[in-house]
C-alpha cells in the first residue's frame, strides 16, 4: 500500500507516495517450538546409535531442535527532497536460521548446530517519473554471522590405524564460526493504473558471503584415552584450531504485487514472489 517508510523493503518505488519526512520502527518476535520424538539413527556399519559422545548410554531420543526466541528489528526512514525525488534508508533482518540438537542427541551426526544471523542496511533513491509511474534503486549492504557445529564418528579412522574402538566411543565435533559483509541491489517499479488499481515489481539481488573465521576440532570420546589416537587424527588434518571460511549466498527474489480499492473502506492485495 506504500502507507509508511517500510515500503522500502516491499517496493521502494512506493516512497514517492509519502510526504515530508517519516520514520517507522517494527519489532518481530519469532518463537519456534520444534520437537522430535523416538529418534533413530545409525552408524556407518548399519548398527543403531546407542551411545552419547561420552560413551555412556545416556543418548537422547526425544528433544527439541530449537527453542530460542529471536527478536528481529526493522527500522525505516523516508525524506521527500522535492516533487520528483525521495530518499530512504532501511535497517532490517532479511534472513535468519537457527537449529540446535542436544549434544547427546541420537541425531547429533546431522548438522548439530546452525546459527545464521543477517542484518541489512539499504540506502535508496526513488524517482517519480510522472503521475502514474515511479522507480527506485537501492544498494544493500548485508552483514552475516554464522556458527556451525558438526559431530563426527572417528571409529573407522581408529580401526584403519589398528586401534580397537567400539562405535560411539571416538566422537569428535567441529565448531566453525565466521562473519562477512556482502553487497547487492534492489530495483523497483510502481504503476498507478488508475485511482483504484496499482501494480508493482520488486527485484532483490542475491548477496554472496565468504564468511571467514575459525574452525576448532574437539575430540571428546573415551576412546581418545588411547594416547596414540588423537595425535594421528590431528596429523590427518583435524587441527585443534585453524582458519576457516564458509560460503553462503542469500537468494535473489522477484515480486509482482497489486492493490485494488473496492470502496473507501476495503482494499484487496495480492503478491506473487519467486
What are these regions (language model features)?
Residues 16-35:
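Transmembrane beta-strand segments of Gram-negative outer membrane beta-barrel proteins
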